[in-house]
Each structure stands twice: as structure tokens, then as C-alpha cells.
Design a protein with these regions (language model features):
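Structural recognition of the conserved hydrophobic beta-strand(s) that form the central parallel beta-sheet
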Residues: 41-45
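Conserved nucleotide-binding/hydrolysis micro-motifs of P-loop NTPases
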Residues: 7-9, 48, 73-79, 121-124
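Conserved catalytic network of the ASCE P-loop NTPase/AAA+ motor domain
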Residues: 32-36, 60-65, 107-109
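Small-molecule kinase domains that catalyze NTP-dependent phosphoryl transfer to phosphate-bearing small molecules
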Residues: 86-130, 136-151
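Conserved phosphate-donor/acceptor-positioning beta-strand/loop module used by diverse small-molecule
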Residues: 61-84, 117
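Hydrophobic alpha-helical packing elements
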Residues: 23, 52, 80, 123-127, ...
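Short N-terminal helix/helix-N-cap motif within the alpha/beta-hydrolase-1
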Residues: 13, 50-54
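Conserved substrate/cofactor phosphate-moiety recognition/catalytic segment
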Residues: 1-39
């Protein structure tokens, strides 16, 4: 299941609720419900804050699921800028970040290393394939039951 924070936040805004933590809280609840049903979840978000990363981990732990934390990065600054500036809205009125907003965003440090994928020179399919190849290994580094988890 693909959970895209942009879509959830857009829907909440259209319903008269402004942006804020509500979109993430809805995503955590949907993720936990679906993880408990045995579904895999792809949580699509910027996830620049340590508190949101921990909330995703906690969601997986409560559901007894494994988690693979993935960070996408583009090491080619020119390519990254081209992608940001060429992006088109997915719905009318969608406000996309400008390059200055992307480069000015504060990314809090990770407290444990994610699986990093450098998207420079790669297609979306190639990047997705790298994640899929890594997924089976995730079960080796996160327990399936909350009682086994140590932070």
C-alpha cells in the first residue's frame, strides 16, 4: 500500500483542515491497520524530522512488522534542481516547493543509518528495484514483535 503524505494533506486541506501533524497521524493509523493485515506499506514523505521517523518505527513495532527506512537523495545538484523545477502539480492548486525551499529545508540527523539510494542518473524504476532487492534483508535487523525491540 502506498501512503503519500502529499495526498493525505491535500485531502485534509480540501476538507477545511490546514496542514500540520494531522496528515502524518492519519498516515500512521492507516499504516498500522494495513500492517496488521499483513500488507506492506510504502510511506512516501519528506520525513526530515527525527520525531516522524520514530513515529513510523513505532507504528511498525506496534503492528509487529519489520521496517526498512529508505532515504532517497540526489548527489548531482544540477540534476536535483532540474527535477525540482520541472515538477508539475498533481492536482489543481497544488503548491510545489521551489528550489530555495528544498535546499533550505532542515534535515535532522538520523539516529540510525537508513538504506540510502542515490537517485542521480537513475530512473524511478531503477531506484525502486534497489529498494525491493534490499527489502528481504530488513527482517534481519528489526524484530517482528514489540517485546523484542530494543532502542
Amino acid at each position: 500500500m502506498h501512503l503519500r503524505i502529499d495526498t493525505i494533506e491535500h485531502t485534509l486541506t480540501a476538507a477545511g483542515l490546514g496542514p500540520g501533524p494531522t496528515g502524518y497521524l492519519v498516515a500512521y493509523a492507516l499504516a498500522e491497520d494495513n500492517l496488521r493485515l499483513g500488507h506492506s506499506i510504502v510511506a512516501d514523505s519528506v520525513n526530515s524530522l527525527a520525531i516522524t521517523r520514530q513515529a513510523w518505527r513505532d507504528t511498525a513495532i506496534r503492528a509487529g512488522a519489520v521496517i526498512l527506512e529508505v532515504e532517497l537523495e540526489c548527489s548531482d545538484v544540477d540534476e536535483h534542481r532540474r527535477r525540482v523545477e520541472a515538477r508539475t502539480p498533481d492536482w489543481p492548486g497544488q503548491r510545489l516547493p521551489a528550489w530555495a525551499g528544498v535546499t533550505g529545508r532542515v534535515i535532522e540527523p538520523w539516529d540510525r543509518p537508513p538504506f540510502r539510494v542515490d537517485t542521480a542518473g537513475r530512473t524511478t524504476a531503477e531506484c525502486a528495484n534497489l529498494v525491493v532487492q534490499r527489502w528481504p534483508a530488513a527482517a534481519c535487523w528489526l524484530p517482528r514483535h514489540p517485546a523484542e525491540h530494543r532502542t
